[in-house]
Amino acid sequence: MMNSASVRWQLWIVAFGFFMQTLDTTIVNTALPSMAASLNESPLHMHSVIVSYVLTVAVMLPASGWLADRIGVKNIFFAAILLFTLGSLLCARSETLNELLASRVIQGIGGAMMVPVGRLTVMKIVPRDQYMAAMTFVTLPGQIGPLMGPALGGFLVEYASWHWIFLINLPVGIIGALATWFLMPNYTMRTQRFDISGFLWLAVGMATLTLALDGNRSLGIPPIAIFALITVGLIALLSYWLHARRNERALFNLRLFDTHTFSIGLTGGLLARIGSGMLPFMTPLFLQLGMGFSPFHAGLMMVPMVLGNMGMKRIVVQIVNRLGYRRVLIVSTLLLALVTALFALVALMQWIWMIPIVLFFLGMVNAIRFSTMNTLTLKDLPDTLASGGNSLMSMTMQLSTSLGVSIAGILLGMFSQPHMAAGSGETHMVFIYTYLSMIVIIALPALIFNRVPADTIKQSTLPRKS
């Protein structure tokens, strides 16, 4: 594929960055109960550890590409790895939940820049006719990360301590930073002026509203401060809307929403990912606290879901071409709600052998819906708006995951009782009520997807080599 050894090394550097970022998105979930015990917190209130990271990624994503073009991909990628590694070290040294949350924010700033800047690096070092092959190479470790994350996290927690889920990032991060500094050229390009005002309005709006959503229960923020956060958040989002209406170079052009499929895909996708974003957080928590599984056993149970997700992506195009976008989105959404209910039933009935089968099917359905949503959202955008639409969709994906985990944490807190024992009847009831609420949330986007036009253009498939 490549003739130049230096280019090959640069692709390996980007691949390791992808691996670090995607591994971290799943390795933490299995460790939350152990973290809670170590930090003297309730395991049902530990969702903020995930929210702080994912929300930071969502806030920082819009600025990452511009920074790479302006300052250089080498400098930004190097800084991203350093920040991610420093955040990992601080996470491992945290002795309170607040320290851990602050460290996750630092880690999230680095994680937000790694993947988009990595993609930009590949675009600059590889000829266009080799871009797909290069991206396939660098994203493969990114697919292995989520596969390894839950089981590796459970293994480290069970046989070492939760601190090691962050400490394992240190040697990889140091090697990656040194390799970036010595082997990667610092590509730059002329950029337009960055929309600082729009970026700040959106960042403030997303951060304050997400914090207000669960600040009272998980962080003890008083009601008057919650009201102030909601007010500030709504004013910030309204200010961005007014700013974007009169600014053609706004961070995200409002003309994006003139495309009907983009509007439906983005709003439906936001609500859909809130529901499905709960699943990677809730599943290992339910298996450990509700069913009494060990961290490693719970982590292993997550592997079939990732395998189902990876295996289904190859045939999504054929399914959409055969059934159409609207039918695929509606059926997959309702099917995901049904399979989620089936998982809770199978687990509570102690049919342990069926759990990995149901989770594999859950991953398959999730992959169909995700891939179809992403394609629908971007497929009709004009070329001049495609980049902005892709960035907005990426930001919305992270934001909706953050909201989903927050809402799952709120539901657990609403239904929980003090001093519940793992595997007890009271704990089972908490998870039953939470899963019933989740099923409704997961099914709701079907109402939005019902508005998808029936006459969609079929997607082409890549030709197979004979």
UniProtKB/Swiss-Prot annotation:
Record field: transmembrane: 11-31, 48-68, 71-91, 105-125, 137-157, 164-184, 194-214, 218-238, 262-282, 286-306, 328-347, 351-370, 403-423, 429-449
Main location: membrane
CC terms in the record's Gene Ontology section: plasma membrane
Swiss-Prot/TrEMBL keywords: Cell inner membrane, Cell membrane, Membrane, Transmembrane, Transmembrane helix, Transport
Membrane topology: Multi-pass membrane protein
PROSITE patterns linked: MFS
GO MF, one annotated term: transmembrane transporter activity
Domain of life per record: Bacteria
Subcellular location(s) of the protein: Cell inner membrane
Leader sequence residues: none
NCBIfam families in the cross-refs: efflux_EmrB, PRK10504.1
PANTHER family the record matches: BLR6921 PROTEIN (PTHR42718:SF46), MAJOR FACILITATOR SUPERFAMILY MULTIDRUG TRANSPORTER MFSC (PTHR42718)
Similarity remark: Belongs to the major facilitator superfamily. TCR/Tet family.
Protein name: Putative multidrug resistance protein MdtD
Annotated source species: Pectobacterium carotovorum subsp. carotovorum (strain PC1)
Classification lineage: Bacteria, Pseudomonadati, Pseudomonadota, Gammaproteobacteria, Enterobacterales
Gene encoding the protein: mdtD
